[in-house]
Each structure stands twice: as C-alpha cells, then as structure tokens.
A protein has these predicted regions:
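Conserved catalytic motifs of ABC-family nucleotide-binding domains
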Residues: 149
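ABC ATPase NBD coupling module
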Residues: 1-5, 56-72, 98, 218-223
C-alpha cells in the first residue's frame, strides 16, 4: 500500500512499501512537524494522512492505537526518548505490553532477540540508559521501535546527536535492518550526503513547503528549485560510502 501525506502547507507525497524516502531541509523547515502529523501526534487544520486505507487525522482512538503499532518513530535524542529509571528489559518490552503482544513471561527472550538484532550484547539487559554510550542508547531506541514489528519507521534526525564514527555504525545498522525486514523508512535529516546514500526518493522542504521531490539521484542531478541547488552547493563532501569506510578504518 501507499501512505499519502498532506501536511504543513501544501505538502503532498507518498511512501511505497519497502522504500526509503529522505526528507531534508534546514532547521525550522517543517520536517519534524510533518513527521508528528504522520504519526498522529500533532493535529493539522486541513489535508489528510492515509495509511493502508485509514484516514489518520480522523481516526478513532482504537484505530490510532492499531496504526501506531504499524508506524513507529525513532527520535533524534535517544537520551530524551528513554526512561532513565528503567532498565533495557523494561524499556524495550514496554511496547509489547502496551499493544498486548505475546505473554509477559516471553518478554525477556523477545528483548534479547531485539538486542542481538541491533548489535547489542545480552548482558546489557538490566542496564539503564545512563550506563550506555550515545550509540548504544540509539540502538536501544531502534530495538524498542522494532519490538512491535512495524511496517514504517519514521526516523527523525536519528544520527545527528552522535559522533561521526558512531553515526556510521548506526547508519549501517539502519540500512541492514531495512533490507532484512523489508521496512519502509521516512528518513529525516539535514545531512544531504547521508540521505543520498540511504534513500530511494528525496523530498526537500523549506519554510513548511515541499520545494523539490523525486528519485534521489534525479534531484541531485537536476534540482528543481533554487533552494535545493543552494543546499547541494553547501553540502560537505562526505558520502555514505566514505562514512562507512571511516567506520571500518576505525575498526568499529
């Protein structure tokens, strides 16, 4: 299916199953607001958000509950997204209980599976967020989002709070998970080099409006707006292969 989105101000696009769509723009461009509207966390004065036939903006509480199992978000700052009072077992199993998935007695085994999937050792099970590195915390946030087996992940600047070598590790993980699980991503970032390497389609926002969209390489090769051209001119020369090569050199 497709998710048609109209939000912020004349913003309209669709996400196809198994596709990675990059959403780029400067701070204040409306990227995160768009994400929150898609998730049903923020209301919109008009337009629509449709997911597999469901009109999200007019959905009942019960419908939204089911929708939020299928659409999960990974935030920019994992420190703010994780409860510091809980250990990883409680943090990652919380969505299982919220959506009534499986039995509580099976939570430990499921959480251990999720930790392994995101590249974390099982002996972290009873650690709290403060006892983890920034990269480990973001992996926990990803594991938590994956717990309910979503179809769409909205990734809001998932790398920007991390150091460059750790960004490379998490980016590599996200690409692998997308391939292995057939996930659909809306990947929000201000880093064009990263978005270019991970996304099939590219959306460019400025001042709450969509100013460019299309296949990623087409937008890079033939930008349709002056704003996009300016973003490309200002783009650092670091491509995703270079980022990943840096991680390998560092032995990460």
């Amino acid at each position: 299916g497709q998710t048609a989105v109209q939000a912020v101000d004349h913003v309209s696009f669709s996400l196809r199953k198994g596709e990675v769509v990059g959403l780029v723009g400067e701070s204040g461009s409306g990227k995160s607001t768009t994400a929150r509207i898609i998730l049903g966390l923020e209301s919109a004065s008009g337009g629509s958000v449709r997911f597999d036939g469901l009109e999200v903006l007019g959905a009942s509480r019960r419908e939204l509950h089911g929708y939020r199992r299928r659409v999960q978000m990974v935030y920019q700052n994992p420190w703010a997204a994780l409860d510091p009072r809980q250990d990883l077992l409680a943090i990652i199993s919380e969505p299982l209980r919220a959506f009534g998935i499986g039995q509580r007695r099976d939570d430990r085994a499921r959480v251990l599976e999720l930790l392994e999937r995101v590249g974390l050792p099982g002996d972290l099970l009873h650690r709290r967020p403060a006892q983890l590195s920034g990269g480990q915390r973001q992996r926990v946030a990803i594991a938590r989002a994956l717990a309910v087996q979503p179809e769409l992940l909205v990734l809001d600047e998932p790398l920007s709070a991390l150091d460059a070598p750790v960004q490379a590790q998490v980016l590599d993980l996200l690409q692998r998970l997308q391939r292995e699980l057939g996930l659909t991503y809306l990947f929000i970032s201000h880093d064009l080099a990263t978005v270019r390497g991970i996304s099939d389609q590219l959306l460019v926002m400025s001042q709450g409006r969509l100013v460019d969209q299309g296949a990623t390489e087409e937008v890079f090769g033939r930008p349709g707006s002056e704003y996009t051209r300016r973003l490309l001119e200002d783009m650092p020369g670091r491509s995703v292969p270079e980022i990943l090569a840096q991680a390998q050199v560092a032995g990460l």
